[in-house]
């Protein structure tokens, strides 16, 4: 049994104490990125549920394979690992790249959770790496998560604004969706000029994923500034898709 296998064996013990988890993660921290990838992969696979996996794959139109872990259970598998990574203060991009290429969707969810947990260590120069995840193995689930990470970077570096304007005109509709949604949750920190420009760039689209996103972005901001959203709808109502208007006005 290798050292890595030994620690994985310990991880399988259901009543392992938090102290032991910390010791295990400290040891895993010393492994190579590839070994860490295999460790995380095995840890998630050990909690697989075939029935739920089939249901999840069907819900996602069989685009991806699943182990069948719900979000809460999946996150419990590696919460201590992410806590240790935050202490380290360094993002393991080779690990994330391996996870993103994995055939099981939970591994892409791990990447999103990892980046959200370590978002304070991200800079504008990391966005090309995140963009590779936005464009690869893409679907609504990962797009709607990764856009929040990009939005956080944008709060600290205004260069992100121009990039999001470029994304809002991209030929890939899911890249455009990420641009539309990247300010979700910003509340009073929302850049309204940027929000308006990105939305206007997507007027005339018949894509459900785009029009829903426009409505959600406006609806989210209406919680903070309903007057701004009402005014926007009044000005642009004739140019907006009915779906966008309906979603945007739900809280008004």
Please report, for each region that a protein language model flagged, where it lies by residue.
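Acidic, Ala/Val/Gly-enriched low-complexity intrinsically disordered segments
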Residues: 5, 13-16, 26-29
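Alpha-helical scaffold domains
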Residues: 24, 28-252
